[in-house]
Amino acid sequence: MEFFGQLDQMLGSSRENNLWYQKALYFMRRSGIIAKEKVFPKVSANYSPLEGLEFFRIDTLNANLLYERLIVSVLALPRRKKEINLTVKMQKESKRCNGSYPPLISESNAKTTQ
């Protein structure tokens, strides 16, 4: 009985929070704070190992909903190339990102690959 009483209290408070959230959204839309609601597309990550890639890992994935930005931080280690070319494909657009080794690593890598 005690458990069900606590469950009712928790559900009641979550309902109150939901109502407060809906009222806050309505106020923000009406006053122009939120000009539009944007629904973000589903994201799927495809990783295909490349022949020239020694190591690949996605470190962080941040979605900034306020400024509509998606920030992906990856660690990629190519076998012999000095520059890394990474292409991020989304539903409507494709962006190309370039990266390179830090100076000390690229110098030592250039010596070992020659």
Swiss-Prot record:
Q: Which domain of life is it from?
A: Archaea
Protein name according to UniProt: Uncharacterized protein AF_0292
Its ancestry begins with:
Archaea, Methanobacteriati, Methanobacteriota, Archaeoglobi, Archaeoglobales
